[in-house]
Each structure stands twice: as structure tokens, then as C-alpha cells.
């Protein structure tokens, strides 16, 4: 069944709004093959948001983004969670940008895991147990630094 013109208009508006949210308006007519990794990542985030999901699954949403755009995307995902009551699940190795916005953390290491609040999970005792190694966790200016037996693992 073909889309009616008002359906097309609504979809175009949703896509335009989503691109604006990720500072990607100029990317609307750019071929994906010529975009940088960060530009492509922002377009993918816009694509996910334009469909107005009730559940947003984000696999490495900050990958290839510079710090300013990583913060923009993290804030955008958080705003979506709050304003649209969207359930958000984020898989990431870049946790410091995401941690201020999460309710719960699932930290997974070689099949072992811990679920809890940021404070319950991001600490020396918990990470030492998960990694089965002497791990030190320090919080510096609202960011976590994890140092293991073989050196640092900045998160």
C-alpha cells in the first residue's frame, strides 16, 4: 500500500528533526560512502531516533565520534529516554561519556558480570572480582580511571 502524502510529509519531518538533533542537516543528501566515520555514526543515530522507538538498542553509539559529538549523542539519547519514556540499552567501551545518564550498569568480563548502580559496579572491589586481578578504580572529575596489574585501562 503506497504512503499517503501526509504520511510522507510526517516521515520527512521526523528525519529532518532527527538529523538536526545530531547536527547532521548537511548530511541528508550525502552518500554514506563519502561520509567520515563520525558523520556516518551521527546519521545512524538520527535514523534510529526518526522511527520513534519505544526500545532503543545502541551498540557502540559513540564509536568514531569526537568528544563534542560523543557528548551531544549521549545527551540526545538521555533526553530521548526521559522525554519519550524510551527504554535504552547501550553497549559501549567508552563508559565515561554514558555513565552520568544511566540508571543501571551491566559490566561484563569473560562471562562474569555485575549489575547495579554506577557506584555499586564501578569500584575497586567489584572490578577486581570481575577481572580476577588487582584492579584500582579512581574517580577523577566525574570520570573513572581503571588501573590493572598490567597498566591502565582508561574508561
What are the language-model segments listed below?
Residues 52:
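Conserved catalytic motifs of ABC-family nucleotide-binding domains
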Residues 71-83:
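Helical segment within the ABC ATPase nucleotide-binding domain
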Residues 56-60:
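Catalytic Walker B motif of ABC-type/P-loop ATPase nucleotide-binding domains
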Residues 130-155:
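ABC ATPase nucleotide-binding domains
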Residues 92-93:
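H-loop/switch region of ABC-family ATPase nucleotide-binding domains
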Residues 7-27:
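Conserved ABC ATPase "signature" region
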Residues 31-35, 39:
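Conserved ABC ATPase signature
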Amino acid at each position: 500500500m503506497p504512503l499517503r502524502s501526509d504520511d510522507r510529509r510526517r516521515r520527512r519531518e521526523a528525519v529532518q528533526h532527527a538529523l538536526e538533533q545530531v547536527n547532521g542537516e548537511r548530511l541528508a543528501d550525502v552518500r554514506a560512502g563519502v561520509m567520515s566515520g563520525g558523520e556516518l555514526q551521527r546519521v545512524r543515530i538520527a535514523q534510529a531516533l526518526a522511527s520513534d522507538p519505544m526500545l532503543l538498542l545502541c551498540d557502540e553509539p559513540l564509536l568514531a565520534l569526537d568528544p563534542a559529538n560523543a557528548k551531544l549523542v549521549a545527551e540526545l539519547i538521555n533526553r530521548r529516554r526521559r522525554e519519550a519514556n524510551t527504554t535504552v540499552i547501550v553497549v559501549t567501551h567508552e563508559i565515561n561519556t554514558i555513565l552520568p545518564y544511566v540508571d543501571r550498569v551491566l559490566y561484563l568480563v569473560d562471562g562474569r558480570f555485575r549489575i547495579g548502580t554506577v557506584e555499586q559496579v564501578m569500584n575497586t572491589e567489584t572490578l577486581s572480582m570481575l577481572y580476577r586481578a588487582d584492579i584500582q578504580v579512581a574517580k577523577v572529575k566525574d570520570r573513572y580511571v581503571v588501573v590493572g596489574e598490567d597498566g591502565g585501562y582508561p574508561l
